[in-house]
Amino acid sequence: MTGPQQGKILLRLENVSREFITGEQTVRVLNNINLTLHSGEMVAIVGTSGSGKSTLMNILGCLDKPSAGEYWVAGRIPQYLGSDALAELRREHFGFIFQRYHLLNDLSARENVEIPAIYAGIDREERRKRAVNLLSRIGLAERLDYRPSQLSGGQQQRVSIARALMNGGDVILADEPTGALDTHSGNEVLNILKDLHQQGHTVVIVTHDMSIAEHAQRIIELKDGEIIADRPRDHAQEKPKMVDIPSVIDIPSMDEKISTGAQQETEIARKPLLTRWKVQYDRLHEAFKMAILAMAAQRLRTALTMLGIIIGIASVVSVVALGKGSQQQVLANINAMGTSTLEIFPGKDFGDMRSAAIHTLRDTDADVLAQQGYIHSVTPTVSTSVTLRYGNKSVSGTVNGVGEQYFLVRGYTIAQGMAFTRTSVNDLMQDAVIDENTRDKLFPNGETPLGKVILLGSLPCRVIGVAAKKQSGFGSDENLNVWIPYTTAMKRMLGQSYLKSITVRVNDDIDLANAEQGVIKLLSQRHGTQDFFVMNTDSIRQTIQATTSTMTLLVSMIAVISLIVGGIGVMNIMLVSVTERTKEIGVRMAVGARASDIMQQFLIEAVLVCLLGGSLGVALSLGIGLLFSLFSSNFSMVYSAASIITAFVCSSLIGVIFGFFPAKRAAEMDPIRALERE
């Protein structure tokens, strides 16, 4: 292949100056630089330390902007472009080769080479194929999956060269490319750069070593920020002895690429691009992978960061589960009193000292209530405490005089025998239904109680049924209870004609509050005054639900504090991560990452930390619930899909909210400052 001819103007600087402010002083690093570079040239910029050569290279590569003057890249003026447009220029036209390689330690050689193509939106398989091809041609086919720490300096610089060529690399900017290499490796790198020049690339070498500069077609000397010489290489001078290596890259010349006056897409960019959503998915996939690698590289720190999120999420989910469990338990206890029931008592309220003297609740009131269309069933109630006897067994218990519908109203189940009937009530029959506690006390040896006669005080009654035990939070389920017809209790035991209370069960399709008003109105008319009060079980239920919800919310707010503390911990660690990975951010920006790409990278990492912490928090909460159920048989934590989904949503929001500032800080970094930071 013949050497390239000088092409059209590619890069041009007019009166470019660059100043930096240090404290109260202004330092001019470049002073009125006028320079034109044509496509296909191989140029060396040489100068001692402090001459401004690196600053000039940064301006050429759109990593920095001039303080004065103008700079053109293929007709475009970078200093008037936004950060994303500058990223596009770097991505599509420039390839950087750094003295210290600037490879990402967590990625393999192939993955390092692929980075520019990720930001260019190239298909995963296409960029992988391209990276393998580039590395194979520069002699690294056997080290595709090696990490930078497993490669020699020369091999790392070759990877850096392949990365510079990934998107085509119209202009290769090499900053001291042999500075950290031995002579043999340095000569190999120079051979590759010269070969790239022969292939049509514009190559700019920045060096302090004139022997390196002599390999270029054109040498530009800088001193104190000014060009003191711009000359072609002296062909009469003996060329340094080089190591002969084969041509490595086969790319169309720059003359072909800009013959129409506009930059054409490189070989890889000519391939069909993915649809917009798939490109975004690919970037998200790579960002996710990098987040995993970053977390894995700092396992202990990641675990400690997640600890606050784990505790916070576990606390919130557990508190909600405890709240729901306690609420369901209390509601079950209320239901044990009877569903949709109204309790009618004499007096104005519980604790009314005059209630004992009010004897206006009668069985006729119960009969009238039973005739109302909105009433499902009614049972009068009287009660007294007596001694229960059978044979030589004597225990204290409660005798309840009730109607035949009592067990239906209260939701009791008859485990043995039967309940008494309306006939038993009308005929004052001495039939009794006992509970399981009474059965166990009076008939401890498993003897059937049915048909047996027991003494309730001095009143003998025949046992016709056994009611199953019923858990209730409003009184102990260990009480001994016996139920007999209320007429029998009133006439043969108590000698009274008034009732202790009336329990009314309302039809399921009737609003309990309306039924309550109906009962109050009816009984007030019968009594001539309201000398009674009504307890609405729905009111109790609503009050307890509201109280439970309030307590759950209160404790949840305390748990949310843990989440906030965890979120602050995530933000702190992400800020540390941004500081530690400043150079990585600079490298990504140099190869074409937009500010949004950098922000997305760190946001995904923050969200991933929080989501993983949230998952572990939910798992911890479920484990707590399992242990809780082992130690508590009559109460359990109740988990809901809504609370778990909410936990994950909260985790994501914490990641976004507390990860936004560190991610924004990373995205707003100046690429050249990031690259220079040690």
Swiss-Prot record:
Its main location: membrane. GO terms for biological process: response to antibiotic. The keyword Cell membrane applies. The chain crosses the membrane at residues 303-323, 558-578, 608-628, 641-661. It is a multi-pass membrane protein. GO terms for molecular function: ATP binding; ATP hydrolysis activity; transmembrane transporter activity. Keywords: Antibiotic resistance, ATP-binding, Cell inner membrane, Cell membrane, Membrane, Nucleotide-binding, Translocase, Transmembrane, Transmembrane helix, Transport. Belongs to the ABC transporter superfamily. Macrolide exporter (TC 3.A.1.122) family. Part of the tripartite efflux system MacAB-TolC. MacB is a non-canonical ABC transporter that contains transmembrane domains (TMD), which form a pore in the inner membrane, and an ATP-binding domain (NBD), which is responsible for energy generation. Confers resistance against macrolides. Homodimer. Part of the tripartite efflux system MacAB-TolC, which is composed of an inner membrane transporter, MacB, a periplasmic membrane fusion protein, MacA, and an outer membrane component, TolC. The complex forms a large protein conduit and can translocate molecules across both the inner and outer membranes. Interacts with MacA. This is Macrolide export ATP-binding/permease protein MacB 2. It comes from Yersinia pestis.
